[in-house]
UniProtKB/Swiss-Prot annotation:
Residues 1-20 are cytoplasmic. InterPro entries: TNF_dom, TNFSF18, Tumour_necrosis_fac-like_dom. GO terms for molecular function: cytokine activity; identical protein binding; tumor necrosis factor receptor binding; tumor necrosis factor receptor superfamily binding. Glycans are attached at residue 74. The chain crosses the membrane at residues 21-41. It is a single-pass type II membrane protein. This is Tumor necrosis factor ligand superfamily member 18. Residues 40-166 form the THD domain. Disruption phenotype: Reduced levels of pro-inflammatory macrophages in the peritoneal cavity following injection with thioglycollate broth to induce peritonitis and reduced AGTR1 levels in spleen macrophages. Keywords: Adaptive immunity, Cell membrane, Cytokine, Disulfide bond, Glycoprotein, Immunity, Membrane, Signal-anchor, Transmembrane, Transmembrane helix.
Length: 173
């Protein structure tokens, strides 16, 4: 008696099997390329490994740094803050005006944060304490500075501002 296979393999079945293997290989290659692209992108993106913090206080007519010399910023001769490391920065501070009765001119109390020649923030108040700041993406070479409409309007002893480079923190979901 002759043994008969239960199922004969047909050329169509063999062709379908090759197509499904080919499809699986293409899908795996695409996943590998996407993973490799993501890895390259994240490794090339400049990120801050550790934070960097600087605080300034106003003395007589100049800002002076009250913290140790940081690695992410530098002060320029004209009192501006030069960014040395690109990243996300938190700018914070408070500007306290002198009492209104000591003001000789009627100019409004205005404080502005500048990045190069662009205004990042403008604050105006009728001689009240002004909290300043925000979170900004800054790049190496940017210059940041605070500008007042009149230095005679500012209490030098209690006015300060600072900047913190925020480290990129990994989030686990």
């Amino acid at each position: 008696m002759e043994e008969m296979p239960l199922r004969e393999s047909s050329p169509q079945r063999a062709e379908r099997c090759k197509k499904s293997w080919l499809l699986c290989i293409v899908a795996l290659l695409l996943m590998l390329l996407c993973s490799l692209g993501t890895l390259i992108y994240t490794s090339l993106k400049p990120t801050a490994i550790e934070s960097c913090m600087v605080k300034f206080e106003l003395s007589s007519s100049k800002w002076h740094m009250t913290s140790p010399k940081p690695h992410c910023v530098n002060t320029t001769s004209d009192g501006k803050l030069k960014i040395l490391q690109s990243g996300t920065y938190l700018i914070y501070g408070q500007v306290i005006p002198v009492d209104k009765k000591y003001i000789k001119d009627n100019a409004p109390f205005v404080v502005q944060i500048y990045k190069k020649n662009d205004v990042l923030q403008t604050l105006m108040n009728d001689f009240q304490i002004l909290p300043i700041g925000g979170v900004y993406e800054l790049h190496a070479g940017d210059n940041i500075y605070l500008k007042f409409n009149s230095k005679d309007h500012i209490q030098k002893t209690n006015t300060y501002w600072g900047i913190i480079l925020m480290p990129d923190l990994p989030f686990i979901s």
